[in-house]
Structure formats: structure tokens, C-alpha cells
Amino acid sequence: MFKEFKTFIMRGNVLDMAVGIIIGAAFGKIVTSFVTDVLTPVLSLGMGKVDFSNLFFVLNGDSYPTLDAAKAAGVATLNYGTFLNVVLDFVIVAFSIFLIIKAANKLKRAEEPAPVTTKECPECCSSIPMKARKCAHCGSAVAS
């Protein structure tokens, strides 16, 4: 059982996927920090708000100065500011991945065409092997 597991893990695609997941998680943390610590404060200055994460609606109609105060009171809230942060995070990650894939596709070499292994018989237009001297379909002689 251990041998099968080792064989499974050592396959190239499993290791590649593991590395991709680890790098993706680290990249996600960088983007989250960028959204939370850099982008959101700049955007909130333009909107006159200090912090997106403090944008919320109290569903029972009461008023609370902060989201933490509303949570401490145990009321139901609609936290649209936190949602906006997550949406910004997703958009930046998705766009970054798009740019990376686009760059990788440009760097990817075009695959070489497969070697030609057949030719056409001049008499019957059938496909025959390149080394054939006689057509298997019509029997006519074919120049090599």
C-alpha cells in the first residue's frame, strides 16, 4: 500500500499540482494583503470612508457605530464592506492569473508538426506509406 502511495505521489502531475497549490496560496495571501492594506485605504479615501470592512447594514433597523459593536450586541448584520474586500481580492487574483497564463502562452513554443508518413497515389489518390513503390489499392507503380 505504501509503495502504491509513493508511486502515486511521485508522478509528475501530482507534484506539479501540489507546488501550484502552495504557490497559489502564498500568492493569495499577498493579494489579500494588497487589497486590505494598500488598495482599500486608497479607494476608501475617495469615497470618504475609512474602512470598507466597517460598511454594514443592521437588519433589525438599530444603529451601531461599528461592525464589532453590532456583533457584540448579537444582532444580524449584512456585511457588504467585507464582501467588497473579498470581491476585490478575487478580481485581482483572477486578473493576475489571466496575465500569467497569457504570458506563458506567448512563451510556449509552437509544437513541431508530426512527420509526414504517407503520400498520395497519383493514379487512384489513395493514401499510401511514404516508402511504398506500388499502390496497395490500385497496383500502379509509384515513384519513390
Swiss-Prot record:
- Respond yes or no to whether keyword Cell membrane is given for this record: yes
Question: Which Gene Ontology terms cover its molecular function?
Answer: mechanosensitive monoatomic ion channel activity
Its membrane topology? Multi-pass membrane protein
Looking at the UniProt entry, the stretches that span the membrane are 14-34, 81-101
> What coarse category fits the chief subcellular location reported for this protein?
membrane
**Does this UniProt record's set of keywords contain Iron?**
no
Q: Which PROSITE patterns match?
A: MSCL (PS01327)
**Family according to the record:** Belongs to the MscL family.
Xref: HAMAP family: MscL
Q: What does this protein do?
A: Channel that opens in response to stretch forces in the membrane lipid bilayer. May participate in the regulation of osmotic pressure changes within the cell.
Quaternary organization: Homopentamer.
Q: What is this protein called?
A: Large-conductance mechanosensitive channel
Q: Which organism is it from?
A: Bdellovibrio bacteriovorus (strain ATCC 15356 / DSM 50701 / NCIMB 9529 / HD100)
Q: What are the top taxonomic ranks of the organism?
A: Bacteria, Pseudomonadati, Bdellovibrionota, Bdellovibrionia, Bdellovibrionales
Q: Which gene encodes it?
A: mscL
